[in-house]
């Protein structure tokens, strides 16, 4: 992975996986929760629809650096993004990223309890796994028969500046 290809790979993963664990630091320490990411790579922004009654606003007021973790266990891809966060009230943005499933929690994007969290990625760490599950199982079985170490390929960890 090189330069823009690195960032492109990060955005591809975020777009494909969608759900992440978002971690904030508040007055009572770290707090993580699953949220659905709404990435906008052209704006270098990951949007989240949140509830204004949650503790995220207070936590971001204490420390606006957040952590986002995306995992694809089947492909052995693990992505951690450090981002700067801000709470936003913008009905146009809420409407543009609104999905039908959001209606399970709110009465549309104009619901007064709908808030937006804007995450601007600063840097990302990507652990790109060596192989698919099938290859890993094959290599494990082969190593059990031959006694040799399994050939699982290269396990790469790369830190990418996202600014």
Language model regions located:
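Positively charged, polar, low-complexity stretches
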Residues: 30-34, 57
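Short active-site oxyanion
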Residues: 42-47
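Short His-Asn-centered micro-motif
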Residues: 49-51, 71
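Short, structured beta-strand-loop surface elements
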Residues: 56-123
